[in-house]
From Swiss-Prot:
Record's protein name: Ribonuclease 3
Domain DRBM stretches: 185-256
Top EC class for this record: hydrolase
Catalytic reaction equation(s): Endonucleolytic cleavage to 5'-phosphomonoester
């Protein structure tokens, strides 16, 4: 993988807040934001304008945005994940491999990757999309992951580097996808985990709905009756998506609890 290094100096005296989604000047602010993302990606861009394009939503620029990179990244992602599954699971048939790949490249999986990469703070959005909760919109986060894959491939001109980056983002998701439980949605997995430990079922509460259809954002809270396990609040384009995201984070939180989980009195 391409080693992490410092980016070149930005243009002198850039406009204040020059990457507050209102301009695409390569400024010191952009350099700083990209440096943070670089550490998460595990890749340093040679062409900063390509990195910028990969983060630009069509609401900011209807012509110069990440949609073409997303198209390329989608194709690369399917190939990289498919190849990894082919070698990782030599005894699985075509149908099973297809379902496993679908699980790994679906929106919910890409949103998890986007959250791990902290992409929401890096996206370049139009004013309306920002106000409408676009930074947490599942479709935008998933698309941005794919666009970054396309951008890394074009920037590096190296499939091996691209593959290494993508697989590092997935971590142990590919190893765990062979587990039938990993193929179930997060809410089902959370419920089964709690039932297996004789805990109460999780409680989901719709906290608020932001914006107007078709660009509404639903905010949901997930609660479990376990000591030292704070509530999880997440948002999504639908209540179902928000609940799934909250359940996924709750599962991760439960797995990190020290000792034996205990029920609240």
């Amino acid at each position: 993988m391409k080693p992490t290094s410092q980016y070149p100096q930005a243009v002198p005296n850039p406009p204040k807040n020059s990457l507050s989604d209102d301009t695409l000047v390569i400024s010191s602010e952009f350099i700083q934001r990209l440096a943070v993302l670089t550490r998460k990606l595990g890749y340093v861009f040679n062409d900063l304008s390509l990195a910028k394009l990969a983060l630009t939503h069509r609401s900011f620029d209807s012509k110069k945005n990440y949609e073409r990179l997303e198209f390329l990244g989608d194709a690369l992602l399917g190939m990289i994940v498919g190849e990894a599954l082919y070698h990782r699971y030599p005894t699985q048939n075509e149908g099973r491999l297809t379902r496993m790949r679908a699980t790994l490249v679906r929106q919910e999986s890409l949103v998890i990757i986007a959250q791990n990469l902290e992409l929401s703070n890096q996206l370049i959005l139009g004013v309306g999309e920002r106000k409408g909760g676009g930074r947490n919109r599942a479709s935008i986060l998933a698309d941005a992951v794919e666009s970054l894959i396309g951008a890394i491939y074009l920037d590096s001109q190296d499939m091996n580097i691209t593959r290494e980056c993508v697989l590092s983002w997935y971590g142990d998701l590919i190893d765990n996808v062979n587990d039938q439980k990993a193929l179930k949605d997060a809410k089902s997995r959370l419920q089964e985990w709690l039932q297996s430990k004789q805990f109460d079922l999780p409680h989901y509460e719709l906290m608020e709905t932001r914006g107007n259809a078709p660009h509404q954002l639903f905010v949901v809270r997930c609660q479990v009756n376990i000591i030292n396990c704070p509530d999880i609040t997440e948002s999504g384009e639908s209540r179902r998506i928000a609940e799934q995201k909250a359940a996924e984070l709750m599962i991760n939180q439960l797995h990190k609890l020290p000792g034996v989980p205990k029920k609240r009195r």
